[in-house]
């Protein structure tokens, strides 16, 4: 499965599970994540969540360039129920990008490698971020002539110094966990 959702006592763990693809987001993965997040919010036994990526190379590299991005841009039609949910259910994109979806429990990001584009946008919606020394962060969309879709233009500048946020957003350059 592209998402592993486990519960242990009061802790929910969400693991993006596509390590060979740097945990890139596909329609199926974002739908499963949205559904798991809804379960997390609604389960009174759960008190904290941990969001991570499988493997040690990437937390999440963002949207899958072959499936997710062509679907959202309209370059390919919906071919299955996962695709249709992404396009027709606003909840799916709101919850999976951790924006416009209220979570009243702490959500911790355990960042174990590259955290790019949509992956970084998800992290902006978490409460605590713990990054491995080798983690890198970037919003490289500007290099493709597009902007981040999940609110990073606003959320990033509210969470880090404005000048640093502008540099990241306007250059697409990566920063390391150490920086």
Task: Locate predicted features.
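Conserved CoA-thioester-binding segment of acyl-CoA-metabolizing enzymes
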Residues: 1-59, 69-74
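Structured loop/turn residues at beta-strand edges in well-structured enzyme cores
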Residues: 9, 44-46, 63, 101, ...
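Conserved catalytic-core motifs of eukaryotic protein kinase domains, centered on the activation segment
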Residues: 61-62, 134
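Crotonase-fold acyl-CoA enzyme core
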Residues: 98-179
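An acidic, glycine-rich surface segment that forms the CoA-thioester-binding/catalytic face
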Residues: 30-38, 65-112, 154
């Amino acid at each position: 499965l592209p998402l592993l959702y486990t519960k242990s006592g009061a802790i929910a763990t969400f693991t993006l599970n596509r390590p060979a693809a740097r945990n890139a987001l596909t329609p199926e993965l974002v739908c499963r994540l949205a559904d798991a997040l809804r379960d997390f919010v609604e389960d009174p036994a759960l008190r904290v969540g941990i969001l991570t990526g499988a493997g040690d190379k990437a937390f999440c590299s963002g949207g899958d360039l072959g499936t997710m991005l062509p679907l959202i841009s309209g370059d390919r039609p919906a071919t299955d129920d996962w695709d249709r949910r992404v396009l027709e259910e606003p909840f799916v994109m709101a919850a999976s990008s951790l924006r416009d979806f209220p979570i009243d429990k702490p959500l911790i990001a355990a960042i174990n490698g590259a955290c790019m584009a949509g992956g970084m946008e998800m992290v902006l919606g978490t409460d605590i971020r713990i990054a491995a020394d080798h983690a890198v962060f970037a919003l490289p969309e500007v290099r493709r002539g597009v902007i981040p879709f999940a609110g990073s233009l606003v959320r990033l500048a509210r969470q880090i110094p404005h000048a640093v946020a502008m540099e990241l957003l306007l250059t697409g350059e990566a920063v390391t966990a150490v920086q």
